[in-house]
């Protein structure tokens, strides 16, 4: 839901227009200074989109009329994936996803391969009207390169619910750029989400006591 919340905000320029009014610019009340548009038929690219979170984003995006692009090294969704045969969910190479999407959402885990995997080259592949959204882990994006791209207005904007350092350093340009929108890592804080975390924890403890260990790694 956090990803789609960002999509909705960007498509209606809610961040910018609310800020304008709060700053006392009521004279611009009906001025069309920020482009807004419908999200129907827009493309959302999901990096790491074949996983649980990416699939959940697709579950919301598809009924809104969006087309979903997913990057996959194998070039296909895992066998049995719920969208394996959907004509509105396409698996494409990463570069094509970046170049074609109106919204790019990062939904992959942070590891040695994904750390700083989104930087200057990747951002410059995106459309100038596109938005980058990160609700995964901050270090997946090279923030120094992102900041330079946002200063150059390479893309329309980015929404960061996660950052490399949380909160960012007080002197970070992330605070100063009007096309960068920060939220304080709230994607997991919804009441229902936190209740699920509590339920999962108690279920895992109960299973361990009964000798039925779940989610074994090794």
Locations of regions flagged by a protein language model:
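Hydrophobic/small residue at the entry helix of a nucleotide-binding pocket
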Residues: 52-53
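Oxidoreductase and adenylate-handling cofactor-binding alpha/beta cores
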Residues: 1-19, 59-66, 200-210
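Rossmann-like adenosine-cofactor binding region
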Residues: 74-173
């Amino acid at each position: 839901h956090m990803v789609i919340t960002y999509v909705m905000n960007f498509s209606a320029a809610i961040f910018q227009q609310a800020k304008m009014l709060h700053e006392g610019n009521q004279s611009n009340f009906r001025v069309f200074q920020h482009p807004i548009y419908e999200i129907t038929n827009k493309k959302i690219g999901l990096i790491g989109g074949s996983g649980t979170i990416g699939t959940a984003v697709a579950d919301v995006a598809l009924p809104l009329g969006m087309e979903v692009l997913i990057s996959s090294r194998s070039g296909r969704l895992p066998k049995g994936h719920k969208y394996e045969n959907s004509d509105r969910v396409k698996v494409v190479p990463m570069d094509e996803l970046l170049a074609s999407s109106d919204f790019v959402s990062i939904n992959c885990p942070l590891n040695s391969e994904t750390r700083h995997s989104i930087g200057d080259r990747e951002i410059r592949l995106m459309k100038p009207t596109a938005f980058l959204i990160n609700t995964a882990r901050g270090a997946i994006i090279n923030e120094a390169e992102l900041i330079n791209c946002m200063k150059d207005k390479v893309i329309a904007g980015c929404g960061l619910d996660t950052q490399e350092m949380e909160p960012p350093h007080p002197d970070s340009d992330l605070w100063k750029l009007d096309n960068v929108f920060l939220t304080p890592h709230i994607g997991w804080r919804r009441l229902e989400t936190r209740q699920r975390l509590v339920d999962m924890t108690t279920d895992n403890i109960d299973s361990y006591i009964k000798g039925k260990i779940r989610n074994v790694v090794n």
